[in-house]
Amino acid sequence: MKKLLLLSAIGMLLSAQTVTREQVDAWMTEISNWGRWGKDDQRGTLNLITPEKRKQALHLVKEGVSVSLAHTLEKEKFPDNPRPLGQQMTLDAGGHAMDLYTIWYHGSTITHIDALCHYSFEGKLYNGFIKSEKISESGCAALGVENQKDGIMTRAVLVDLPLLKNVPYLEPGTPVYPADVEAWEKYAHVKIGSGDALFLRTGRWARRAKLGPWNVAASAAGWHASMMPWFKKRDIALLGNDGVQDVQPSGIDKAPRPIHQLAIVALGLPLIDVMDLEAVAAECAKRHRWEFLVTLAAVPVPGGTGFPVNPIATF
């Protein structure tokens, strides 16, 4: 009898964590933020970072210690870096050095923020903008990265699941569920709330340092699609992790990146992909404090789908 009850409980748990393509499509409407900040809004959940929220975040600075959350750009080609940084130097007779960069930042080795025009669904962008009317070869006529030019400053919470699970890193393909994040809240004595930035450390860079590069775009630990209603309920303003956000493979037929689709298009939630959270994880563990002030800004490229960023944590 006990065995049957256990099997039943396991079955219910697995069922609760199974998300279908139909559910993802339904969430596009059910958890949508379209119209929440007006029909012309182009900032999405960044609206949740109010002046009061910024002032509260400043109180988290106690020591003035700052840590970068960005991965240093790489010039070598690897399985997770098929399009490495290009740098062309120019030296003139006057002794000045200049360079031209070629950066394919929408990948899995360059820390970058996604603008809200980066993803679409059924011909529409966040807040109902029509893709065919707003996106062309010359850029995004709405929802471009220039809408973030005033910068982002808020409270950030680091979720360090390898620490919670007492492992050096999560294996590729490991999904992260709401129960994992809530277990972390209890462990770290934090409560994730409105206007917060939420950063997930999977230990991707620790695994890479030990075992070498692999194709993170095809196989990575990350958020499970079932996190999306949770993100909406908690009113997360900014989402990031050290991989490509979505667990890969997603496990959902015809929905390879449900986190990207739902976060960007339905919620208007900007994403920071490919963060390097190793140093900040060490600083947090040293202090037994997993909340801090985070600041960042993207270069306001008109109509840009995103830009490389260097988020800074300050304790």
Protein language model regions, located:
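Basic side chains
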Residues: 2-3, 201
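Sec-dependent N-terminal signal peptides
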Residues: 3-12
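Active-/binding-site microenvironments in catalytic and ligand-binding cores
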Residues: 17-315
